[in-house]
């Protein structure tokens, strides 16, 4: 158990924000900043000397993450209640059964923890050394107790940090096959992030209604073939492009898993911008074009460069699209309106009129509670291309 010794007094604005369900507090809202701990700790937040919340503080961040607005112990029962409630929401409200994002950080009042369930395999991203040291065993025990999980694979630290991952349960089981509608996918929990992008689940299923047999479909930044497989099982010929040879190998395995003939798919390893430029020069066209790039910015300071990259990518995609154009952004710092404006300006430049069919976001197992705009990151717009 972590002893909570430090009390930090917050200003009125932060207090009102917490009362309106925000789960983040900026250090600039702390009145007694000189009392901020020198290491990662759980702290008590007060307003006019009265208890407001318990929060996780990391000196490497300008944000404190709210753990609870109740004056309760952070212990086994604390984690059990939240993990159980998260499971009930996915299974009883959303009707997800075997595969889903079980824990979505602040969306489930469990900051720094991301956990995906793929049948009997679980994959966790853990971004707090304190939570790992003090509570990881409890969290893992609870996840096993509440499910049919056989293996939990824990990815620790941030990108670039050389920290060995942890494995609980069956240490030789890393791969499973999940179902998504009529599609099947191999998932390896040792892959990028937690192994598969569950946030796009509903958007991949939605894509199917726009696919006609014999369509040519271009899937840019296809990763392990999520959109490609859904297009292919509806009779399309698919071309997928990605920089990662490892991801493309899994994409090909996923296509084969769904019994798609070899003459109906092609995967190209390469830079999306360069590949699309060559396709335009060769006067290629596709009935459906999907753009699903990685985040072009991780910080607010780099938004202008990110928007330029989105503008270029969308311009190229629109030039290649004949009927349906699907474009996505997973950059937290590029909001919905900003992204839409960028796509529209790219359409003007390409001299193509687009009609917006739908503006979608992340799957509902990535919950966005009111007062927490930071939890909303995925944008996915479906357009009809007028000819």
Curated annotation (Swiss-Prot):
Q: Does the keyword Hydrolase apply?
A: no
Question: Which compartment or compartments is the protein found in?
Answer: Cytoplasm
- What's the top EC group for this one? transferase
Molecular functions per Gene Ontology: methyltransferase activity; RNA binding
Tell me which SMART domains the record gives: PUA
The reply to whether rRNA processing figures as a keyword in the UniProt entry is yes
Q: What is its main location?
A: cytoplasm
Q: Which domain of life is it from?
A: Archaea
Signal peptide start-end: none
Q: Which key words tag this protein in UniProt?
A: Cytoplasm, Methyltransferase, RNA-binding, rRNA processing, S-adenosyl-L-methionine, Transferase
Question: Where is the chain membrane-spanning?
Answer: none
One GO biological process from the UniProt record? rRNA processing
Q: Where is the PUA domain?
A: 5-81
- An annotated GO cellular component: cytoplasm
* Enzyme Commission code: 2.1.1.-
Q: Which family does it belong to?
A: Belongs to the methyltransferase superfamily. RlmI family.
Query: What name has this protein been given in UniProt?
Result: Putative ribosomal RNA large subunit methyltransferase MJ1649
What organism does the record attribute this protein to? Methanocaldococcus jannaschii (strain ATCC 43067 / DSM 2661 / JAL-1 / JCM 10045 / NBRC 100440) (Methanococcus jannaschii)
């Amino acid at each position: 158990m972590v002893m909570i010794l430090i009390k930090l007094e917050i200003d009125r604005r932060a207090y009102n924000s917490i009362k309106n369900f925000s789960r983040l507090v900026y250090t600039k809202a702390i009145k007694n900043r000189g009392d901020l701990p020198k290491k990662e700790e759980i702290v008590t937040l007060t307003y006019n000397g009265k208890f407001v919340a318990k929060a996780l503080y990391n000196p490497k961040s300008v944000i404190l993450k709210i753990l609870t607005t109740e004056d309760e112990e952070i212990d086994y029962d604390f984690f059990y209640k939240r993990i159980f409630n998260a499971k009930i929401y996915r299974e009883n409200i959303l009707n997800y059964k075997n595969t889903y994002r079980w824990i979505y950080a602040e969306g489930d009042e469990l900051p720094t923890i991301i956990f995906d369930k793929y049948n009997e395999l679980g994959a966790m991203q853990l971004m707090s050394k304190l939570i790992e040291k003090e509570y990881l065993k409890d969290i893992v025990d609870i996840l096993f107790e509440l499910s049919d999980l056989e293996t939990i694979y824990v990815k620790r630290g941030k990108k670039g940090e050389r920290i060995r991952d942890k494995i609980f349960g069956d240490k030789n089981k890393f791969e499973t096959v999940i179902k998504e509608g009529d599609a099947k996918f191999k998932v390896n929990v040792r892959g990028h992030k937690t192994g598969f992008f569950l946030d796009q689940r509903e958007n991949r299923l939605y894509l199917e209604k726009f696919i006609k047999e014999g369509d040519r479909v271009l899937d840019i930044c296809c990763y392990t073939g999520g959109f490609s497989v859904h297009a292919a099982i509806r009779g399309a010929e698919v071309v997928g492009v990605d920089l990662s040879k490892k991801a493309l190998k899994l994409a090909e395995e996923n296509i084969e898993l769904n019994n798609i003939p070899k003459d109906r798919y092609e995967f190209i390893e390469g830079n999306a911008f360069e590949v699309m430029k060559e396709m335009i020069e060769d006067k290629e066209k596709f009935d459906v074009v999907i753009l699903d790039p990685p985040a072009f910015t991780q910080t607010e300071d780099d938004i202008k460069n990110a928007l330029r990259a989105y503008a270029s990518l969308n311009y190229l995609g629109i030039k290649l699209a004949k009927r349906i154009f699907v474009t996505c952004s997973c950059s937290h710092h590029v909001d919905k309106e900003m992204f839409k404006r960028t796509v529209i300006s790219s359409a003007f430049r390409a001299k193509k009129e687009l009609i917006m069919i739908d503006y979608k976001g992340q799957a509902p197992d990535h919950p966005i509670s009111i007062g927490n705009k930071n939890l909303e990151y995925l944008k996915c717009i479906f357009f009809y291309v007028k000819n």
